[in-house]
Regions:
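N-terminal amphipathic/hydrophobic targeting modules at extreme N-termini
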Residues: 7-11, 15-26, 31, 36
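Short, positively charged and aromatic/hydrophobic N-terminal segments
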Residues: 10, 20, 33, 40, ...
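Pre-Walker A (pre-P-loop) alpha-helix and adjacent loop at the N terminus of AAA/AAA+ ATPase modules
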Residues: 72-109, 114
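Walker A/P-loop
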Residues: 103-140
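Canonical AAA+ ATPase core
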Residues: 155-160, 181, 185, 193-270, ...
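Walker B catalytic acidic pair
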Residues: 176-177, 188
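C-terminal engagement/docking regions of AAA+ P-loop ATPases
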Residues: 304-384
């Protein structure tokens, strides 16, 4: 049970970490596997010391202990969602964890990848796993903003205008090939993405909660496309790529899909209400002053770098903070570490900066890696 792949632990340096490990193992001992020096811990010895660890933890506040337990339960629930999605999507666990971090942070995701790599199935599998309403829009040059948001239709028999909701009124929306629509149509999503509402003819209507936009675009085929404006691309919490499967993963795909589509048999493991609670919980994840300073130093460096025409704005700073909080919670921690900040640097910031070498592939990623190498990560305690 202890050899199952799980989320990385990081350094275990305080009694709070021990309590967190015990909580996770008590909920489901197959849920967590210790890594690094934790592999040396004998399972029997650890559980034999449960009482001592819990007594030591009583020196902290009840609120801290409750948060640790809630985070352990949340991480277990997210693992259940991931395991459910993995029945449809083979591999890509790291991508899914980042996508879930953006979702729980209240953001949206831009998937830039080749056709046929499983982007649509990923969105559908996530929606099915949380019992959410799924919507899909195929963006084309002739698509109108009203086709996205909805419009008022005059009912002649009643003599009134009646609002017909567009496909954005759902929980998880797949905006397929978003860069094929005109900028006017693309702009119809701005209010949805940022304010979670739609305004038609001066009347604003709240969207369903939770709402998560997964937009896709083809990185190679550019004929007949309209590049996303900075104002819109900045509203995506992360830009991710699933990539092609490995040989082992592709063989598993063949075996899994040789008969029925596993997506049709997928059952929900939680509800949208559970997701809303997880979104609230991730905002309570602790971020120490040293980690906050480290995060802001990275942001400031993007504005001062000679190779960048535009750095990250304050909206990006807040998105970065919320994403690392969610990412820490997904890994079962009630606090953020510098490794979380490093891990999400490129997915969260890569699409928000403009490089003078924009025509060169991977230039922004290289600049961000350079910034990470130049700024020393904090080494002091990150827990409360």
């Amino acid at each position: 049970m202890w050899n199952k792949t799980a989320f990385p632990m990081g350094n275990v340096n305080k009694k709070a970490d021990c309590l967190r490990m015990v909580c996770l193992c008590c909920f489901d001992e197959s849920f967590f596997s210790f890594q690094g020096h934790c592999d040396k811990i004998n399972k029997t010895r650890l559980f034999g010391e449960n009482e001592r660890i819990l007594q030591a933890a009583k020196k902290g506040t009840v609120t801290d202990m409750e948060l640790q337990i809630q985070v352990a339960q949340a991480a277990k629930k997210i693992m259940e969602i991931q395991n459910n999605v993995s029945k449809v999507i083979v591999g890509k666990e790291a991508v899914f964890r980042k996508l879930m971090a953006a979702f729980l942070a209240g953001g949206n995701v831009l998937l830039e990848d080749m056709p046929g790599t499983g982007k649509t199935k990923l969105a559908r599998a996530l929606a099915a796993s949380i019992d959410a309403e799924f919507g899909r829009i195929q963006f084309t040059p002739d698509l109108l903003p009203s086709d996205v948001t909805g419009l008022n239709i005059y009912r002649q028999d009643q003599g009134v205008f009646e609002f017909t909701a567009g496909p954005v009124f759902c929980n998880i929306l797949l905006a397929d090939e978003i860069n094929r629509a005109t900028p006017r149509t693309q702009s119809g999503l701005l209010e949805c993405m940022e304010e979670r509402q739609v305004t038609v003819d001066g009347v604003s209507r709240r969207m369903k909660a939770p709402f998560f936009l997964i937009a896709t675009q083809n990185p190679v085929e550019t004929a007949g496309t309209y590049p996303l404006p900075e104002a819109q691309i900045d509203r995506f919490a992360m830009q991710l790529s699933m990539g092609y499967p490995t040989m082992e993963e592709e063989l598993a795909i063949i075996d899994r899909y040789k008969s029925d589509d596993p997506l049709a048999q997928l059952e929900p493991v939680c509800t949208c209400e559970d997701i809303l609670q997880l979104q609230e919980l991730c905002r309570r994840i602790y971020v120490s002053d040293s980690v906050k300073k480290y995060l802001v130093q990275i942001i400031q460096a993007t504005r001062e770098h000679d190779g960048l025409a535009m750095g990250v704005n304050p909206r990006g700073t807040l998105s970065y903070l919320h994403c690392v909080q969610a990412y820490a919670m997904i890994q079962g921690r009630e606090y953020v570490t510098p490794d979380d900040v490093k891990e999400l640097c490129v997915p969260v910031l890569g699409h928000r900066i403009i490089s003078y070498r924009a025509g060169q592939s991977g230039s922004t990623k290289e600049i961000l890696q350079e910034i990470l190498e130049q700024i020393p990560a904090p080494t002091e305690e990150w827990t409360r």
